């Protein structure tokens, strides 16, 4: 499972209020691959959920294509044992989560056709606790294409 190698603080504030504010500022475009899976809701996604989604995608695409995981579980959520009285400190770190805001690209995929990518992303989305959508990489306009009018004027 995914987890940081070392952290400065083992126990951190939950900060759920911050999670529900606004959209993702970074990581909201497909950069490495041709297709991506974009989050539509805010959530904490656990290391196990990320791994389950990755396995679902890689099993479907078999040996073709490459998968990039664009999120990492940096935050530790703590939990106290069952039937323990209130107080006496914060519980032990139980699970590692990635803080995901709407608009964040969770996974990227390249080297497969669009139909295969869409089905692989659909299978991955079923393993996650949030609504997601399939997105394609936007073609960057090169300076040479911008001068001549680009692809829109061809034909």
From Swiss-Prot:
One of its GO terms (cellular component) is cytosolic large ribosomal subunit. GO terms for molecular function: rRNA binding; structural constituent of ribosome; tRNA binding. SUPFAM superfamilies: Ribosomal protein L16p/L10e (SSF54686). Gene3D superfamilies: Ribosomal protein L10e/L16. GO terms for biological process: translation. Keywords: Ribonucleoprotein, Ribosomal protein, RNA-binding, rRNA-binding, tRNA-binding. Part of the 50S ribosomal subunit. PANTHER family: 50S/60S RIBOSOMAL PROTEIN L16, LARGE RIBOSOMAL SUBUNIT PROTEIN UL16M. Binds 23S rRNA and is also seen to make contacts with the A and possibly P site tRNAs. This is Large ribosomal subunit protein uL16. It comes from Symbiobacterium thermophilum (strain DSM 24528 / JCM 14929 / IAM 14863 / T).
